[in-house]
């Protein structure tokens, strides 16, 4: 098993895409979701040559964004609230095409209230707001940018293996947007390390935009050669040229199933040995 894992490791370059494309992309870190700040940083990134600019999670309602005209000629992918009938989603949106992915792993109590129906009458009695976001469907189409499919992940969805594998399989790179401002001092750095691990795991670039840090563009091949990330609390942007990679690593093909099967075999052998 260990020999097989070593043979299939990313260092063997088994998962490099011969038809890879280059894309100059930027992440924006506004610290606060203010359109004046976003506009300033976005224009700087565009002037720096960025073809696509990534905004963080939950910038504003998408209807509010669509009412503005200063971003009409810029390819922006960002996090917005989408109101559809009586439902509200938090989504990644390609603002050039209006294609979107709705977050499906919502944060309990922060984005939705567990046992909502059971607690509705109690909330009304104590005058507690009862609004929750709506969970996105499990099966959603991939969002494209310049006809390139990417994996869109919002906040802690990066940590859900099944969501990560499902959204990242058969895509060219990963966009991760988040608002880590409420996590405290240490969690943003841990979130960034997890993003770096996902880059290596999938052999795809991770483009990570957060509200107030830590934002970065992460290479799966040699992370040391890239410029510094944007530290927490700093208004800035970062631009890098990334390479697309449509190939799937072993993990993206099989997910956690090999580990689960191996664990089951170990437990089964232990039980058999115990009963001898």
Regions of interest found by a model, annotated:
Residues 1-14:
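Internal/C-terminal transmembrane anchor helices
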Residues 12-254:
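Soluble catalytic domains of enzymes that build or remodel membrane lipids, polysaccharides, and related
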Residues 251-276:
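Selective detector of the "anchor" transmembrane alpha-helix that sits immediately C-terminal
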């Amino acid at each position: 098993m260990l020999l097989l894992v070593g043979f299939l490791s990313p260092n063997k370059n088994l998962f490099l895409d011969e038809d890879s494309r280059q894309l100059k992309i930027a992440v924006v870190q506004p610290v606060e979701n203010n359109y004046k700040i976003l506009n300033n940083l976005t224009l700087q990134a565009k002037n720096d040559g960025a073809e696509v600019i990534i905004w963080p999670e939950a910038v504003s309602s998408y209807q509010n964004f669509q009412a503005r005209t200063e971003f009409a000629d810029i390819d922006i992918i960002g996090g917005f609230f989408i109101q559809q009938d009586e439902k509200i989603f938090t989504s990644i949106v390609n603002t050039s095409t209006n294609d979107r992915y709705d977050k499906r792993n919502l944060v309990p109590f922060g984005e939705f209230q567990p046992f909502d129906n059971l607690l509705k009458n109690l909330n009304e009695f104590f005058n507690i707001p009862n609004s929750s976001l709506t969970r996105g469907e499990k099966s959603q189409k991939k969002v494209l940018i310049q006809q390139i499919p990417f994996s869109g992940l919002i906040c802690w969805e990066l940590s859900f293996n099944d969501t990560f594998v499902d959204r990242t399989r058969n895509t060219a790179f990963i966009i991760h947007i988040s608002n880590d401002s409420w996590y405290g001092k240490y969690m943003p750095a841990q979130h960034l390390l997890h993003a770096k691990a996902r880059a290596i795991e999938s052999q795809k670039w991770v483009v990570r935009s957060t509200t107030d840090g830590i934002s970065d563009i992460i290479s799966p091949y040699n992370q040391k050669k890239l410029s510094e990330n944007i530290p927490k609390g700093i208004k800035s942007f970062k631009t890098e040229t990334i390479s697309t990679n449509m190939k799937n690593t072993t993990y993206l093909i099989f997910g956690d199933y090999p580990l689960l099967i191996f664990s089951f075999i170990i437990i089964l052998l232990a039980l058999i040995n115990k009963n001898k």
